Amino acid sequence: MSAKEAVAKRILELCEERNMAINALASSAGVSPSTIYSMLNSKSQNPGIVSIKKLCDGLDISIRQFFDSNLFDDLEQEIK
């Protein structure tokens, strides 16, 4: 799994745990829904750490908690 796929899956996982819609997350994180949807649909080549931090703020979690998931354990090599 690529890093961007893992980020997308983690966002969906966290929203599902909190019964939170993407639009609600966007509102609480201060980003547009299209920003999140582009991260989820792999249109964003590199979801930036600032965007991820805003989502973490909207989810009321730390960056460490965001990346504390088995999804990030065996990521494929990004340098080809």
Where are these regions (language model features)?
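The alpha-helix within a helix-turn-helix
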Residues: 15, 26, 56
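Recognition helix of helix-turn-helix/homeodomain-like DNA-binding domains
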Residues: 30-46
